[in-house]
């Protein structure tokens, strides 16, 4: 999940939790519906061109199922993605280490449970809300499975997957989980979001995938909130969800509205209208004044840490990539909010002297024939044949040290069991001594051959030596 999306969720919790009805009147934007017959020029483009040879592109993504927006993305945006061989995201969502690190950063310290960090009443309210979600999931996914019997087991598995280890997670991540357990999000669960779909397509087409951030840089701002701020945010989130269940409040601006704005409307007016300031409270009680002040402090913190500071960091790393690799083309796919408003990545790039141009939906892209990707093994082997053998890259490959297998052989000798007859160890049940007897056969089958253990140990040491610099 992109950190910008997390910030939008957090801010929306405060907005809706304080005065949902007043917010409804402030968010009445004209939404233009798009269909297949809509002309290409009316589609909204989130593509920017960095004028250089070869070209580099910025593309603004949105964290929704790609099937809802892919057909409305202008053709020149898709062509820019197809033509680029180096695709960079905020995080590399195709990397298993990245996904494991994301899960790890959400967890509380070892031995600490969520009930120990929350007030008792709030923890009971949270459990009650999760039980409600578990009861509602089978009804929400009825359109997938017509038979109730098949929907039940799937619903239970889906609930367990969405709420896995929730009682061991940090409260801020539990709050984000609660806000994502909505009917519309659960119905589309399993469909890759747009940025994830682009990463999968880049991997399938053997493009070189990279990231401009690491997991710690996205997790630390969220985990750095103090306990009182997190409890306050989770309380506001639960309060809104409880009022929503009782029918006391309605969501006036939904994900569908955001998708319509992304496809053919003005996303800038939507994103930044909800980021300007918190709505003014009409009731001047001391409690609400304290809540408003605390919400504004959290709002300012997230605005600075998750938007402005990240824009600076990502823009600087983009500039480093462009300077260090002038011969390569690039396609940078970040959250759309990072390219809009003041102090955006586009503004920072222009301040550093780069000519960045907004690309309209029907605008032609600069002609450039990208070099063939060298991402596959077969293509990498072909790269050092013929005249290319004298290149610096190929010479470096020759200088690499081969693994020192003598240490592995010594280890094999040291772990080998003494065998005076020098006969090979039985590898088949029929060759084992006493195999004629049924009980002996079972005993021979249950005994692990010594060569299996030795082989596993040898493989482990080989990997250790190989990745420790013995090349």
Swiss-Prot record:
MF (Gene Ontology): metal ion binding; metalloendopeptidase activity
Membrane topology, as annotated, equals: Single-pass type I membrane protein
Entry-linked InterPro entries = TIKI1/2-like (IPR040230), TraB/PrgY/GumN_fam (IPR002816)
Coiled-coil segments: none
Look up the domain of life of the source: Eukaryota
Query: What are its E.C. numbers?
Result: 3.4.-.-
The record places the following residue ranges in the Extracellular compartment, namely 25-449
Gene Ontology terms describing biological process: negative regulation of Wnt signaling pathway; proteolysis
Q: How is the cofactor bound?
A: Divalent metal cations. Mn(2+) or Co(2+).
List locations, semicolon-separated. Membrane
Q: Tell me where the transmembrane regions lie.
A: 450-470
Leader sequence range is 1-24
Q: What does this protein do?
A: Metalloprotease.
Protein name, as recorded? Metalloprotease TIKI homolog
Q: Which organism is it from?
A: Nematostella vectensis (Starlet sea anemone)
